[in-house]
């Protein structure tokens, strides 16, 4: 097995891709087992343990912080740059829920970045001034995303996919652009809401509703669809619902 360093997986695009392929060999693993396998591939990470990070039980993003630290060697920070700056890649962790029929879909939206407050529409200046989404400040947080997906029910690893905006199917990219234009129009009319947006939407963010903070994020159906496509799972759409099944592993009998 080829051994990597933290620098390898954070700065070398080819090794980063191969590292994600390595992670996906352990779909269905507990996080503890995944960390163990990661440390075999990147021995330098043996000194990066969950106990190093102090988080409270109510911290909604604690799994994300643990994963980013134990798998990529990144400590939590408030820096606006992508998590892997050399590769311009943002690391996101989300959870998928199991439906009654045994299928899966995204439990919640994937927040990208705060963009302003409805208490002061001038705070949306970045969006108002940029007709092209690629020129916005938040675009660097969505251009390239490594999405790590966990099972909500048992916290096992469902897989990791790399989302490159520039390589999306034209239909997906067109819808995102349409959504962005809708968001800008609502800002212009001071009527911000997420109504009518399909993949990218503007939504309330933060604990204090009175602050009027809004963020942009990818909606559940987009996250579900992009993950399933990259994992080669069949996508099922019924009305507004989007979900997929994970094929059962074949058992060999001798």
Predicted regions and their residues:
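Nucleic-acid endonuclease domains
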Residues: 1-84, 93-254
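Conserved active-site neighborhood of enzyme catalytic/cofactor-binding cores
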Residues: 89
């Amino acid at each position: 097995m080829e051994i990597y360093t933290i620098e390898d997986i954070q700065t070398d695009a080819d090794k980063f891709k191969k590292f994600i392929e390595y992670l996906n060999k352990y779909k269905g693993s507990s996080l503890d087992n995944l960390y163990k396998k990661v440390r075999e591939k990147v021995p330098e990470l043996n000194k990066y343990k969950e106990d190093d990070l102090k988080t409270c039980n109510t911290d909604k993003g604690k799994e994300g912080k643990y994963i980013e630290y134990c798998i990529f060697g990144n400590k939590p920070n408030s820096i606006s740059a992508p998590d892997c700056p050399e590769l311009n890649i943002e690391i996101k962790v989300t959870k998928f829920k199991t439906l009654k029929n045994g299928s899966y879909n995204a439990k919640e939206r994937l927040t990208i970045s705060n963009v302003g407050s409805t208490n002061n529409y001038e705070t949306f200046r970045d969006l108002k001034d940029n007709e092209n989404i690629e020129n916005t400040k938040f675009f660097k947080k969505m251009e390239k995303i490594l999405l790590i997906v966990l099972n909500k029910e048992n916290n096992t690893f469902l897989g990791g996919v790399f989302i490159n905006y520039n390589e999306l199917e034209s239909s997906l990219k067109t819808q995102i652009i349409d959504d962005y234009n809708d968001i800008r129009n609502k800002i212009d009319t001071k009527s911000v809401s997420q109504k009518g947006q399909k993949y990218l939407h503007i939504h309330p963010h933060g604990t204090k509703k009175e602050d009027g903070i809004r963020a942009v994020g990818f909606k559940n159906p987009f996250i579900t669809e992009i993950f399933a496509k990259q994992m080669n799972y069949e996508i099922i759409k019924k009305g507004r619902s989007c979900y997929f099944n994970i094929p059962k592993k074949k058992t060999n009998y001798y």
